[in-house]
Amino acid sequence: MSDVIMVNTEYIPGKRIVKVFGTIWGITVRSRGLGGNLVAGLRSLAGGEIKEYTKMLSDARNTAMERLQSAAEQIGANAVINVRFDSSDIGQVMTEIVAYGTAVLVEDVTDNIQRVGLS
C-alpha cells in the first residue's frame, strides 16, 4: 500500500508543504466493447442505471488514482493535493478518465514553541 496522501483540498491538516513538484496525472482509457454496448443499449431502452458502465467507470477511476499515486512516488512526492477527475469520450466506444492534482512534499507540523522566561 502506498504512503502517498491524496486529498481534494489545498492543504492537509497537520502537514506543511515544503516542496511543490507541480501537476501530475494518472490516465486510463477504457473501451466499452461491442457486447457491453449491446447490453447497455438494451438497458437504456428500459431506463435506469446502466450497471455495466457504472462498474467500468468506477474501475477506471480506481486505476487512474493508482496511476496518480505511482506518478507521485516516481518523482519523490509524498502527497497530492487538489485531486480532481476529468473524463471524455474518444470516438463512440472509448472513454478516457484522468485523475490529476498537485504533487507536493509534506512534513508534519511541529509546534516548536520555546518558552521564554524573565530572569
UniProtKB/Swiss-Prot annotation:
It comes from the Archaea. Pfam families: YbjQ_1 (PF01906). InterPro entries: UPF0145_dom_sf, UPF0145_YbjQ-like. HAMAP family: UPF0145 (MF_00338). Belongs to the UPF0145 family. This is UPF0145 protein Ta0182.
